[in-house]
Amino acid sequence: EDTYRGEVNDPDTLHLYAYCKNNPINYVDSSGYKYSPQKAANYAYKWGVHPNPKYHEYSKDCTNFVSQCVHAGGKKMNVPREPLTPKTDELNMFWYAKRTKDNVWHITRPWRSVKIFYYYWKVHGAKTIVKSKFSEIEKQFKIGDIVQLHRNKDGWYHSVIISCKINGKFRYAGHTNNHSKNPVKKLKNKNNKWRIIRIK
């Protein structure tokens, strides 16, 4: 059973109840474990250049990759009860990347789409920050932040993750053009808006 504040149905889950009770509920999932932006960033740094073979890789892989990072940070996949089908993959209420026993991948739009990833996590409690000056968004960066880029001809078109600091300067990781520690100044190039998705 799920663990909720004020209710302990199973003595074996008492430690999870105590964890939930002493931490803000909007920062803790029902399993009693906290999301870790650092773990998400560590995954990004590790798999930024060479993709994790456990996952499907797209030719335009940016949001698929940041979803992997978020999952590594502690967010569980949101999977329907019914069997996975191409129809469930297109539903915006779910977030998963699963391979079936017959080796078919099922990956939802919120997992792989720049725009729908944003809307999914905004609904699920992420803090969002949007700026039209790079100097202003850069001041807001934290390790593990998802950053999305906008340009006039494409709209919101790319997702990356702040992966580390080197000599006091933030670096980011991303896929499509694979990298694990690019200087964040490169995010300024040819873009006119930036938004942070800070998952809790």
Q: What do these predicted ranges mean?
A:
Residues 91-172:
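...with weaker cross-activation on analogous glycine-rich loops/strands in unrelated enzymes
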Residues 152-200:
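Active-site signature of cysteine proteases
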Residues 1, 12, 29-31, 78-82, ...:
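Short, solvent-exposed loop/turn and secondary-structure capping segments
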Residues 1-34:
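Short turn/helix-capping motifs enriched in Asx and small/polar residues
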Residues 17-20, 63-71, 159-163, 172-174:
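Active-site scaffold segments
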Residues 35-111:
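N-terminal capping segments
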Residues 11, 36, 54-62, 130-141:
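Extracytoplasmic/periplasmic, Sec-exported soluble proteins
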Residues 7-8, 52-56, 183:
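A generic structural signal for short coil/turn motifs at secondary-structure boundaries
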